[in-house]
C-alpha cells in the first residue's frame, strides 16, 4: 500500500497555503516524505540503520535536534546521516514532531525488550532501543561529539565495571546527567546531556541496563569521566 504521507502533506499545504505548515502533524508527514523513516524506527515501524527515535524527544532538546537536522556533519563530521537540505519550515515541523516523541509510540505495556529473560541480553536491548547507543556508541565505545565538555566527546561506558559498583551505576542512570561539567566554565552549556532515565524506565529495566554495561570489559579501557 502506498504511503499516505504525501497526501497528508499536500492536504496540509493546501489548507495552509498562506504559510508553510508546522507542528507535529506536519512534521510527521515531512519525516515520512523525505525518507527519515527508512533509517529510523519509531515504535515498531521504520528502518534500523540509524538510532531508534521512539524516545528521542525525551533524550534531546529541540535546540539540539534543530542543529542536528540542519547540518548533521557540522556536529559530527563522520556521521552517515545525509543533509536533507530542508526548508526552515520543514525542519521546524520535523523538530516539533521529534520533540514530542517520548515513548508513546510503543504499544501500551509492550516494549521491545519485554519477554527477554536474561538480564544482560535484556539490558543490551534497552541500551539499543531506548537510545543510549545513539550517544554512547555500540558496546559503550563512546566518541560521540558534545560541545564544551572535556575532550569534546561523550564518555565511553565500556569501562563502567572499573568505575562503578552496580548500585552506583543504577543511581547514575536513574538520575542522569542533566548538566554535564563544562570544559570552559564561562562557555555555553553542553547541548547533549543524559536524561533522568528513572522518569521513563522502571527500576527493573534500569537494573538490566546496568547489568549489560557492567558486562562490558574492554582491553585497556581508560577511566571513565561519566
Language-model segments: residues:
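Solvent-exposed, polar/charged alpha-helical surfaces in well-ordered, non-transmembrane soluble domains
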Residues: 29, 63, 67, 92, ...
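C-terminal capping alpha-helices of c-type cytochrome domains
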Residues: 64, 84-110, 195-226
Amino acid at each position: 500500500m502506498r504511503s499516505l504521507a504525501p497526501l497528508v502533506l499536500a492536504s496540509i499545504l493546501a489548507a495552509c497555503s498562506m504559510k508553510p505548515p508546522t507542528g507535529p502533524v506536519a512534521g510527521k508527514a515531512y519525516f515520512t516524505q523525505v525518507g527519515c523513516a527508512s533509517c529510523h524506527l519509531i515504535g515498531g515501524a521504520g528502518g534500523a540503520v540509524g538510532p531508534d527515535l521512539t524516545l528521542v524527544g525525551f533524550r534531546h532538546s529541540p535546540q539540539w535536534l534543530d542543529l542536528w537536522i540542519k547540518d548533521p556533519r557540522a556536529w559530527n563530521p563522520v556521521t552517515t546521516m545525509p543533509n536533507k537540505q530542508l526548508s526552515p519550515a520543514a525542519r521546524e515541523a520535523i523538530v516539533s514532531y521529534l520533540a514530542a516523541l517520548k515513548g508513546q509510540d510503543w504499544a501500551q505495556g509492550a516494549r521491545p525488550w519485554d519477554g527477554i529473560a536474561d538480564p544482560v541480553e535484556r539490558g543490551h536491548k534497552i541500551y539499543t532501543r531506548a537510545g543510549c547507543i545513539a550517544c554512547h556508541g555500540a558496546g559503550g565505545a563512546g566518541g560521540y561529539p558534545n560541545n564544551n565538555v572535556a575532550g569534546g566527546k561523550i564518555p565511553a561506558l565500556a569501562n563502567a565495571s572499573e568505575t562503578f559498583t552496580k548500585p552506583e551505576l543504577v543511581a547514575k542512570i536513574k538520575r542522569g546527567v542533566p548538566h554535564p561539567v563544562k570544559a570552559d566554565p564561562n562557555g555555553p552549556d553542553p547541548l547533549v546531556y543524559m536524561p533522568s532515565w528513572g522518569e521513563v524506565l522502571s527500576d527493573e529495566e534500569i537494573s538490566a541496563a546496568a547489568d549489560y554495561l557492567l558486562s562490558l570489559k574492554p582491553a585497556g579501557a581508560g577511566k571513565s569521566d561519566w
